[in-house]
Structure formats: C-alpha cells, structure tokens
Amino acid sequence: MMTYEGKLIAEGLKFGIVAARFNEFITNKLVGGALDALLRHGVAESDIEIAWVPGAFEIPLVAQKMAETKKYDAIICLGAVIRGATPHFDFVSAEVSKGVAHVGLETKLPVVFGVLTTDTIEQAIERAGTKAGNKGFDSAITAIETVNLLKMIQ
C-alpha cells in the first residue's frame, strides 16, 4: 500500500497571496501570519507576491488570474467576512468559498481558502492571531504541504 503525505519543505517555491482590504484590520494579521509561515519554511521574500483586492468577493477572480500565469506553486486566499444584519454575509461567503474551490480545480493548482467567515468581529480577531491561532499561518502551511503532496502523486 502506498501512502502519500506532503512535507513542509518550501525552499524554491513561489506563492501568490490574494488578500481582501475589507476588514483590513483582520486581513493584515492573516497576511502577517501567512508571511511568517512561508518565511520560516524557507520561502524567499522575492518568491512571494501579494495582490490586494477590494473585498472577499473579488478574491476568486484575482486568484484565477494569478494561477493562470503559472508563476506560482500555490495561491493563498485571505480575507474576513463577518456576519451583519442582512443576508449579504451568506451570499458573499458562499460565492467566495465556491469560487476559490473552482479556481483550484480548474487550474490544477493548490488554491487555499483562508477566508474567515465569522459571526462576530471577536471571532475574527481570535482566528487572526489570538486565542484560535492565526488562520493565515495555517493557510500557508496547508499550501506548502499541498504543493509537495501533489508533486509526490504525479
């Protein structure tokens, strides 16, 4: 029986990050966490590019454009969608998650969903580097591992 498991080896890999400016207080912390993880695992700063988009809804389109350039080994998508008093949260959350998944399947490239979808600002803060860790860091680790896993399976 063959078992595959991705390694956390990132030297020489290139990463694109798509980050939403909306809820920038949160997203900046997610980007910081992602950069920390990538740099700790040997990615050169020159091998990381960040595209800032207005809001989470724009993430899938820009992620697809970045993936299509074939410059990156993975794309990390970061943002924060926080529930409000209207159904807007439900529409945005659903479309962003579907869009990010679609880009990965279409381009055969790891496209990691690191968009927080929380009920409160407090929950978002907890997931951006306090009580619940940093989901930006976690997303970068997922990207590294998935890149290496796909290389093993080919």
Curated annotation (Swiss-Prot):
This is 6,7-dimethyl-8-ribityllumazine synthase. Catalyzes the formation of 6,7-dimethyl-8-ribityllumazine by condensation of 5-amino-6-(D-ribitylamino)uracil with 3,4-dihydroxy-2-butanone 4-phosphate. This is the penultimate step in the biosynthesis of riboflavin. Its EC number is 2.5.1.78. The active site is at residue 88. It holds the Pfam family DMRL_synthase. It is an enzyme of class 2 (transferase). It comes from Desulfitobacterium hafniense (strain Y51). 5-amino-6-(D-ribitylamino)uracil binds at residues 22, 56-58, 80-82, 113. (2S)-2-hydroxy-3-oxobutyl phosphate binds at residues 85-86, 127.
